[in-house]
Amino acid sequence: MRQKRFLCLKGIVFAWLFTILLAAGGQHVCFAAEENVPQQTVYDDAALLTPEEIETLESELDAAGEKTGWNILVLTTDDTNGKTMQEYADDFFDAIAENGDGVALLIDMQNREICISTGGIASRYLTGARIEDILNDGYEPISDGEYEQCLSVMLKDVLVYY
């Protein structure tokens, strides 16, 4: 009788360990698959950028993200859904960013403004005065209709302050 209890207990422990290991192994495979999926970094909802400009920006954003470890995103919009551009940029960043660290650069065509949203550790690097400097550098190209150039200049300025 004691032998049967021992075998039963041994079987339960083995099944429990097998289940734990299988679950942990399956989780690892899922995480590995997610790592290979590139994250979108340019959201051109206002259709301001050409495919070539989007490709160039994505390359710059990917390199900047690797350097900083931040989520760095670009958004263009022509409708902020009744929100201020800062609220819109903040909500967008919070919804899209994988972690809280990073920057979203926004061109808002509805209000004809540019905006920067920061999150996490990026907020320590990009103070209010630095954001103003970055925005000031972005106004010249955007006033000439050079949207990609505006975003590229702002991104380079972000990296200066990193």
Language-model features: locations:
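A structural boundary signal for the start of the first folded domain, especially the loop/turn
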Residues: 2-162
